[in-house]
């Protein structure tokens, strides 16, 4: 009975501002295993973007995410996408259609994926912005909020 409550509390702690990276492993589109720590805490700000091909709001937000990526990718900003898809081909097709060029990971388990468990993600789109040393500095930045935060951090 307490397990779901504990999972929620732990997930919320894992994405609290100041929390260190809570690591997990998922595969890329070619089936190669990666840890989130392969991308986060490597000396640049990293946005972890939780999304899915079937999520209309996720797809609607993607042009903004792309614009931020293009503006700041050479200034110390990276993105890693975590897909909540269950269909590999739908995931691949969506990244092509949306022009997503940053790394993508998924275990193709939908809402039962490891990322949803570790960070207690219950709705998408959802984001976590990590500092260069791998600590959470913001969550759920969308629209102008993402661009404003990146400008604050990287337009120096």
Model segments located where?
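Oxidative protein folding and maturation machinery
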Residues: 1-34
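Generic structural signal for well-ordered beta-strand positions
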Residues: 34-35, 137
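Conserved redox-active cysteine motifs that mediate thiol-disulfide chemistry
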Residues: 44, 50-67
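Short beta-strand segments
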Residues: 49, 79-83, 105
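Structural microenvironment flanking redox-active thiols in thiol-disulfide oxidoreductases
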Residues: 60-98, 110-117, 148
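Thiol/disulfide oxidoreductase modules built on the thioredoxin-like
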Residues: 100, 107-155
């Amino acid at each position: 009975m307490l397990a779901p409550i504990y999972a929620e509390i732990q997930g919320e702690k894992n994405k609290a501002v100041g929390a260190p990276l809570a690591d997990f492993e998922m595969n890329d589109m070619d089936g190669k295993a990666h840890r989130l720590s392969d991308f986060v805490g490597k000396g640049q700000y990293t946005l972890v973007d939780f999304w899915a091909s079937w999520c209309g709001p996720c797809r609607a937000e993607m042009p903004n995410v792309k614009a931020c990526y293009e503006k700041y990718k050479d200034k110390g900003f990276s993105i890693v996408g975590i897909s909540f898809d269950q269909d590999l081909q739908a995931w691949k097709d969506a990244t092509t259609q949306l022009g997503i060029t940053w790394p993508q990971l998924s275990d193709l388990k939908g809402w039962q994926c490891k990322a949803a468990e570790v960070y207690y993600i219950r709705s998408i789109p959802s984001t976590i912005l990590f500092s260069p040393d791998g600590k959470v500095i913001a969550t759920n930045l969308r629209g102008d909020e993402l661009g404003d935060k990146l400008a604050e951090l990287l337009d120096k």
